[in-house]
């Protein structure tokens, strides 16, 4: 998790299964820890264990704040969309509303070339961190408005 400093990363790993509401009261004891980021990561992994268990099983996945995680597709829906892509028999894919990248991460496995587009820079940063951890080496991440990027997309 390159987006987190080493103290925060260690805190996240050490307290992964604890109640974030309780941990929030311990911020003064851990001055080197970016507590809001740590709590986002801990809570994110806890939600992912239920919603996207395959992601939760991968060490180092970086999770967004709670709202983005709540709005993303679950693993079952993402796998279903990947089956649809497989049935289409296409070789390339462009996701114009990348978001957290859950749907994209499964659909991209079904094609030889995949492009993730997202207007929010911080979600693109998360995607660039997470996709290699998910063994997606044939993907491209582009930040910007879909309408502006469309003419240059494959």
Indicate where each model-derived feature is located.
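SAM-dependent transferase fold signal centered on methyltransferase-like domains
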Residues: 1-154
């Amino acid at each position: 998790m390159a987006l987190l400093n080493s103290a925060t990363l260690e805190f996240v790993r050490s307290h992964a299964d604890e109640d974030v509401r309780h941990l929030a009261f311990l911020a003064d004891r851990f001055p080197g820890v970016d507590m809001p980021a740590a709590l986002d990561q801990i809570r994110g992994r806890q939600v992912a264990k239920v919603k996207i268990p395959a992601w939760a099983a991968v060490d180092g996945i970086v999770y967004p704040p709670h709202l983005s995680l709540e709005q993303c597709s679950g693993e079952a829906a993402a796998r279903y969309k990947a089956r649809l892509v497989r049935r289409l028999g296409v070789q390339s894919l462009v996701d114009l509303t990348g978001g957290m990248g859950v749907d994209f991460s499964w659909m991209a496995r079904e094609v030889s070339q995949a492009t993730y587009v997202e207007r929010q820079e911080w979600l693109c940063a998360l995607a660039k961190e997470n996709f290699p951890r998910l063994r997606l080496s044939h993907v491209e991440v582009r930040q910007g408005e879909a309408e502006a990027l469309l003419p240059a997309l494959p």
